[in-house]
Every structure is written in structure tokens, then in C-alpha cells.
Amino acid sequence: INFSSIDYVFNCLPNENLHKRSDLLKSDVSIIDLSVDFRLDDKNDYENWYGFKHGNFEVNDEFQYGLTEFNRNKIKKCKHIANPGCYATSILIPLIELIKQNAIKTDDIVIDSKSGYSGAGKTKGKKELIKEVNENIRTYGIGDHKHIAEINQELSKIKNIQTEVFFAANILPVERGILSNIYIDTNEVSQNDIYDILQKRFNDEHFIQLLPMNEIPSSREVVGTNNLVIGLKKGYKENKLCIVSVIDNLVKGAAGQAVQN
């Protein structure tokens, strides 16, 4: 391929492919990468979390983690973009501003996410996937899901404090959509203060919607859109709160966010 006539390339190949493409990486074309190959800052994390040795880590710094709502200015200046993972997108967007404002505790964040079976990609045939998930719910990646690496990485950057979440994923018998329940403890602020922080931060963000307090979104609301919808539910104690976020894993969690970036 003659890359000199191309401005942008969207890499939609599976993980462990782009980092081997020295010809593309050393060209002048800008890459929007939907794989994991350039999401992580630590070379060892690729081997520890994904089981492969990175072949072109020297260009890793040319990739900006592409969470548009928080990295807009950096994206404008970078050469390449590493598109965030689908689960990570649904989790990071509701949490980043709250951690910036020191509004929540970061040492006990628990996340339970549910995804449609399309999140498995094309490693299995559609009929086989439907058969596997029909009348079934399956939990996987408890404490060791691969997206934990980028979630911890991006949350730890906010206040330069190591942050580690406890995360589990579930596959549901629906084709698409992600719903993440994020359980947090507030940090000497009220639950209404949490709501106000999110409302102020996302008021002008086209693709982010915050529902009224105690209204909970469902995945059906966002299927086929690039939207992320957030709901807050007050807990049994004043410092307990559940954040519910929903996205379409194939749009905001993948292709739509790539175009947005």
C-alpha cells in the first residue's frame, strides 16, 4: 500500500497485529487504532496482561489515549490515537472528574459490567455465540480482566496516585450494549455534590447524558448511538453511591469513538 496518498488509517485488526507493522508505523499517515497495541504506557504490561512482547514500543509515545471528552486538546496535537477499550470507556468517563475533584475514595472502587455477546468479536461464529449465551449469564475476568490495565493506568494518572479497581465482566444474552455498575464511597461530600460535579462537567458534552438523580439507564437507550448515559442511585448510607453507565460497545465503545477521536 502506498501510504503517501492516505491521511488516516483506522486499524480494526485484532490485538497483536499493528505493533508488527513497521511500514505503517514509520509512515506519515495518522493511525486510529482500535486494538490494544498502543494503549498501555508500560511495555511490560503488554506481556503481563495480553501475553505478547511489543515489537515497536519506541513509537508508543506517538499514540495518545483517545478518550475525547478528557483528552481533546492532546488528541489535536498527537500523530496517532489509541482508541480506549469498550469496558474502559464506560468506566473512565463517569469516574475521571470525580477523582479530579477528590470527591470519591480511590482505594475501594468496585465495578460490575455486563456486555452483549458482540463484545467477543469474531473469534467465534455468531450462531455459536448465540447458542452459548442463550438463557445464560456468564461472569469472567474477575479481578484479572485485560481492560483493568488501562482502567488503572488512566485513573492513576489523574492525581498521580496508584489506583486499582476491582472489576468483573458478565456476558448477557443480548447482541450489543454495555451496562456498568460502579460502586463508590464518597469523600466527605454529599451524594448531591457528586451529581452536581458530573452535571457541570458534562453539561456541554454532546455524547454524554446525565439522568436525574435515582433514574437508572438501560442499554437499549444507547444501542446504535455514540452516547454514554449516566445514572446515579443513592446508597443505604450517605457515603455510598452507585453510578450506572451504558454505552453501545460497538459504537461509543469502538467505531463511533474512533470516528469521534
Question: How would you describe each model-predicted region?
Answer:
Residues 1-135, 140-142, 233-237:
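N-terminal Rossmann-like NAD(P) cofactor-binding subdomain of oxidoreductases
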Residues 89-92, 123, 181, 252, ...:
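Short, electropositive, low-hydrophobicity segments enriched in small/polar residues
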Residues 1-3, 12-13, 107-113, 117-244:
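C-terminal substrate-binding/catalytic lobe of Rossmann-fold NAD(P)-dependent oxidoreductases
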Residues 89, 188-190, 249:
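A generic structural signal for alpha-helix starts
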Residues 236-240, 244-261:
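An anion-binding loop in the catalytic cleft
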Residues 92-99, 148-152, 199, 231, ...:
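Predominant activation on well-ordered alpha-helical scaffold segments within soluble catalytic domains
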